[in-house]
Amino acid sequence: MSSPAQPPPTRPPVAAPPPSLAAAAPISVQPPPLQPKPPPHPQQPPQAVVSVGVGPPPPTPQHQQQQQGPPGHAPPQQRPRICFNAHCKDPKSDGPRRRGWRLRNGDFAELCDRCYHSFEHGGFCETFHLEVAGWRNCESCGKRLHCGCIVSVHAFVHLDAGGVECVMCARKSHAAMAPSQIWSSSMHMAQNVADRKDNFVKSWRPPAGQFSSQWRQNNMWSMSTMQSDLQQRLAFEFDRPSGSEKLLPGRTFIHAHEKKFDDMHDRSTTPAGMNQIMRERYANGHTQHTTLDPTYAYTLYHREGTNPNLHDHSHHAGENDHLTARKGVTSDPCSSVSTTFKLDSHHPSILKDDPSAVPAGLSSNFSSANGPKDHIRIGPTQQQQQMASSSLQKQFYSHSVIDNDFQAQLRNGRPRMDAKARSQLLPRYWPRITDQELQHLSGDSNSVITPLFEKMLSASDAGRIGRLVLPKKCAEAYFPAISQAEGLPLKVQDATGKEWVFQFRFWPNNNSRMYVLEGVTPCIQSMQLQAGDTVTFSRIDPEGKLVMGFRKATNLSAEQDQPTKPANGVLPPPEANNKVVVPDSSPNAAVPRPIKVNTESKSSSPVEQATACKIDKGALPQKEGPGTSSSSPLPVKRKATSVGPKIKRFHMDSEESMELKITWEEAQELLRPPPKAPSIVVVDGHEFEEYEEPPILGRRTYFVTDQSGENHQWAQCEDCSKWRKLPVDALLPSKWTCSDNKWDSERSSCDSAQEINMEELGEMIPIKPGAAKKTKGKVDTDNIDVSDGLDTLANLAILGEGESLPSQPTTRHPRHRPGCSCIVCIQPPSGKGPKHKQTCTCNVCMTVRRRFRTLMMRREKRQQSEKDSGVPRKREPGQSSEPVPQSGSGAHPTSTSSPHQRADTNGEGPEDMSIDNKRTSSPVKNQIDLNSQPEREDEQSPKSDATRLLRDNPT
């Protein structure tokens, strides 16, 4: 009877829908809550129990087929890789999910309990990646770090000089950290391992796009250390609004207007750079953020902002508490974020103009010298910007560039100079700007004015050459880089707002460059600058325009400011200067220059301008001749462009300068130790003599050894120029006389005779030829007459002889030797040369006299031949106006000549050997007849006639 009851147990195999449905969806093999069949689920356990108890073989293959699925998917279904760790062999347990590190696609690595325990305690790589490459040692403590793994990216930092360092050592040294390959490691500085992981998971959010991590990496490395550090700190240590840093899908580059942040490494991290970041926020219309919200500085680098009020939906519930996450970051005392200044973007009181809402220490930093109410024309918006920049700067740059100088600049609201430029440029190029000038520079413009450098105009810069030489380091630091010598045109704005186009180029100079601005003459003339004045160069940010200002010389500013200074001592407004215009409200408005630079008042009519010009000229001391008109309204042109007083040429022929004609080795011999005994100091076995007084300049002496072998020295008296013999150890002062001779009482007076004559002394002492002539020149100076131009040939011969001064200066060429006889080298400077007496018997004077005697004899013969032949002779200047009779008239030719001519004829003779110096009164004085040809004596030159007329008897 039991046989009919067999069909009911066969229903489970017949009930094919459950297995078919299970086989139709083999991918959904997951835990029970993910099964897609809720109705048969409660009936399946009883059927399974009955099937196991009645007939286990039939349901077992179907159940295995249901779990395995198709043959192609059999291996992954047999050994499911649930744990994300590739080195973990244990499948995932029934426990909750364990989140590990974040993946590149935005998901999290799902780990088992064992792997998660290793990851949580920071030993994941030490447990599973010991055999994997990429291990390096910490440069400080030697700890092993896995640098080639995404799991350990938060455990180390990159050093600037190369190598890596663990986070603990980096926290101790407070080193500036560079970003890692994908994420910044600076966010983990103030947290332990567990807090680092939690904060990393909560705050990190990947940007959209296919190459998000690569774009983030390139963007970080293209910025400076300051930018990347600021960007990453604001991105991870603070809870930024959702979507503010997102990129549009497919965007892998930065716009051109964002590229100006990339060159911030060329500028110092001064408040100007931070003000520029905060000011850029209002320029782009992001007015929803507060000025003290630190998340906005990160938003500037990613301009694809969305609604900042939306929360990040990628964060799980309970993990996006802004205040909790922020407190977790700032609670650590080692954190670089100040805990006294609460950076929370949800406090509306900071947006108000209430002074009580301003944090302590910020309101006083921006007050000017005029009082706490004057904020240097800074509105509420600018005040918030400066407070934000100051707070950010105190947080991120407290160990780098903040010093007393920059704190003083913060009080003025503008930087004086770039910190990098101050360390590179010479002090004479530093822009010297006072607080008042800085206040007028800021004006009503929202732009930041950064003084770059200044340069004093030289005579060539202020001349008509049309070029301004720039300091090399200043040009390379602030002007565009040029590779060709032709350069490029450069637009520069002057103090009145007018734009000038200069040619910025360089000249190759000894493997270097000399940078110049060409075409600056019209600009300098419009500013009425001259040599000695100073031109200043500044930069207007963020436009990057160059501003060329000026400042008058200090020796003229006091006198020029006198007419325009008011009686009450208050500086006049900008309208009182004709070199400064009222600044416009536009960003490109002219920058007003300092008040003390300008010296003239602005006039509204030509008459007032002429009056002002007269007043300005009357305040300056001018040298005007008798024909100079001082009432002209036009500016008087300067004849000389030299700076300061005119430097006269140093005359080397003066008696005082003769003492300087010694070499450096000879000057060392003149140094004598002080009279006091020195103190002996032994340092490392070496004895040193220390004197309390400096060495003195002693008298020059000559050490001589006589025939008997005795050593002594010879010195010359300062008064009588006599030589005295002194002991070897005698130390003489610079003004030594015979009265100071305490070693020889017989010759302690200038009246005493010299021991030996000059010939014997010259054999022992190497006296220069100029030494004796120097003393003789003092006596015979009054008896020497000025030589004339006819002695040029004599000068050449004298310079060739050894009797003259060897150091006689001439206007010779730079590379000519001292014995050069060219027309340039033989000319003495300023017409001064060797002087000869009338009775001089040197070779040159004798040669000149013989030459003159020969010329006179030839002339007499010619005149005699003319008289004999009856050829009419040309009238001379001294002849009378009577006509010369022709030959055959019966009258003697000499009877009709003038008395002067007769006297000249009688005066000519062989005994005439000298030239009278009275000839210097002739109109042809000091002239050389270069056209004179002795072989052509038929024509007489006027010079020879004048010489013959002024000649007298040599006796």
Swiss-Prot record:
Compositionally biased region (Low complexity): 62-71, 382-392
Organism: Oryza sativa subsp. japonica (Rice)
InterPro entries from the UniProt entry: B3_DNA-bd, DNA-bd_pseudobarrel_sf, Znf_C2H2_type, Znf_CW
Protein name per Swiss-Prot or TrEMBL: B3 domain-containing protein Os07g0563300
Keywords annotated in UniProt: DNA-binding, Metal-binding, Nucleus, Transcription, Transcription regulation, Zinc, Zinc-finger
Ranges for region Disordered: 1-81, 325-392, 556-642, 856-955
Binding site for Zn(2+): 717, 720, 738, 750
GO MF annotation list: DNA binding; zinc ion binding
Record-level GO cellular component terms: nucleus
PROSITE patterns assigned to the protein according to its UniProt record, in alphabetical order: B3, ZF_CW
Bias type Basic and acidic residues, positions: 343-355, 862-877, 939-955
Main location: nucleus
Disulphide-bonded residues: none
